[in-house]
Amino acid sequence: MKRFGLILANVVSFVWRIMPGRLRLGLLTGLMVLDSRHRDPGKGLEHLLRLRDKLDWVINERAMAYGYGEHPKHRLTRYHDFFVRHLTNGQRVLDVGCGYGAVARTIACAYPNSEVVGIDQDRGRLAMARTSENPPNLNFVEGDATASVPPGPWDAVVLSNVLEHIVDRVGFLKALQGSTLARQYLIRVPLFGRKWQMPLRRELGVDFRSDPDHKIEHTYDEFLAEIAASGLTVHEVQTRWGEIWADCRRDENHA
């Protein structure tokens, strides 16, 4: 059955691709317009927004292929530069939730005298991280940072698109301060107000998260409140590319 499905998909794909591009685009547009013409405009919008989610999934999948396994957003948004710019050579840096290791690799290459360790509980992603071209000052560890971290003390902790996956974010940040003894926390999270469609999605009851595992996508005020509640102080913060990038420091009065 699976083999038949693949053959059928290849046949349909061939027929589709030999059609002129303008015809394909017109057909797709027409189908989306028809799908949106619900008696209730809100229901029509719901359908379109869910279609957009599927399209975004396909775009991201193709973007990964285009980038030979690494999403072009790393290169185009240059958010790695934020982490590098706020660190110094010689620091011990722990990248929590390192994924494929792209950020940790950039930091380790930029600062050869630093010890950089990435920790993640996803074995598949860690396997890819370990087989990449890594500098000698970079290592990867399998583990759940909500339970334990590699022995410190650490100078800086990187949390790139991690906090939004945690339920008790304040408790997690407090625990990290105790387990790592780091004074610097470089944090990147998605911003709820990145598009006008986010509050519209919430109003319509359509999922507005960029990842179904996200427990929150912060407003600016929510982010600042959680950082303050954890005992950290925001040293610098900026919003770029629909995200919050922050350099936070441990407040010794709350240690």
What positions do the PLM features span?
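Short glycine-centered segments of the SAM/dcSAM-binding site in methyltransferase folds
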Residues: 92, 183-186
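Activation segment
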Residues: 149, 166-170, 196, 212, ...
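Short beta-strand segments
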Residues: 160, 186-188, 245-247
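A short glycine-rich, Lys/Arg-flanked "PGG" loop and its adjoining helix->strand segment in the class I
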Residues: 171-184
